[in-house]
Amino acid sequence: MRTLAIDIGGTKIALAIVEEGTIIQRYQIATPVVQDVTKFVQAILEKVTEWLPSIDYVGVSTTGYVTPEGITSINPETLNFPVPFPLAQTLEQLTNKPVSILNDAQAAAWFEFVQLKNPSLNMAFITVSTGVGGGIIIDGKLHKGNSGLAGHIGHMSVAIEGPLCGCGQRGCVESMASGNAIQKESEATFTETMSNVELFKQAAFNPKAEAIINRSVQAVATLCCNLKACLDLDIIVLGGGIGLAEGYLERLNKAIQSRPSVFHIPVTPAHGDYDACLLGAAFQFKE
């Protein structure tokens, strides 16, 4: 079985042919800045037209809130789709293939759960990337909730007087810990423009850079402890460009260990590395 996996993020879209859990071919494009769903899908498919005859299924993981009607952007600053955005329906029409779609972190959570050596564990996947998202596995099942909203843990508030999030709340984890949040804080702190990659390099000898990263880490640590308190999870798996940046996981586990022991929970790196969401898109067809 070959699946065309499509992972839609705020800045880029990753595409791959996945067979038996292995990426056979891959391609990456910038996320199209178009509001028309047909043009959006065409911009994706034109890069991989030659793949389609060999594909059995299309699996999509996407930032945003996925409902049967389409995709809704909870935080338009991360990805601003018209509401609802009927991506899956349009993909089915243009590819004539079965299409399944999940929120990206929910998809990654399922992929990471399948990789666990102990399938009895209750777990969460957290991605710290352009935004912050999550997926929750309880009793061996992906918990999506009645409407599909479950797992949007980046919009749990960890600072009631914190910065205004694009979703409309204050102090969301996403508004304090995401790549976008780190970039905003960096721009407010330094006179020269600095990428997040450079910020992490600077942190070893620049206290201001370290403080910006630590702000993100502390917000995610609070989120992890809250998930432990709320769901009594066994493990958390961390992914995303920020979450997998050098030194971030070590900082995070140290921050969690500084909290009361009843809220401690182990955090491990994603088995799928930076491709957890992409592989999760394909693994929707593995029940």
Curated annotation (Swiss-Prot):
Top-rank taxon, per record: Bacteria
Sorted UniProt keywords: ATP-binding, Carbohydrate metabolism, Kinase, Metal-binding, Nucleotide-binding, Transferase, Zinc
Listed InterPro entries: ATPase_NBD, ManNAc_kinase_bac, ROK, ROK_cs
GO molecular function: ATP binding; N-acylmannosamine kinase activity; zinc ion binding
Protein name as catalogued: N-acetylmannosamine kinase
Keyword Kinase: yes
Ligand binding (ATP): 5-12, 131-138
Matches recorded under NCBIfam families: PRK05082.1
Reactions accelerated catalytically: an N-acyl-D-mannosamine + ATP = an N-acyl-D-mannosamine 6-phosphate + ADP + H(+)
Signal peptide: none
Keyword Isomerase: no
Positions that bind Zn(2+): 155, 165, 167, 172
Pathway membership: Amino-sugar metabolism; N-acetylneuraminate degradation; D-fructose 6-phosphate from N-acetylneuraminate: step 2/5
Pfam families xref list: ROK
EC class name: transferase
Task of the protein: Catalyzes the phosphorylation of N-acetylmannosamine (ManNAc) to ManNAc-6-P.
PANTHER family: N-ACETYLMANNOSAMINE KINASE, ROK (REPRESSOR, ORF, KINASE) FAMILY
Assembly: Homodimer.
Family under the similarity heading: Belongs to the ROK (NagC/XylR) family. NanK subfamily.
EC number: 2.7.1.60
BP-aspect Gene Ontology terms: N-acetylneuraminate catabolic process
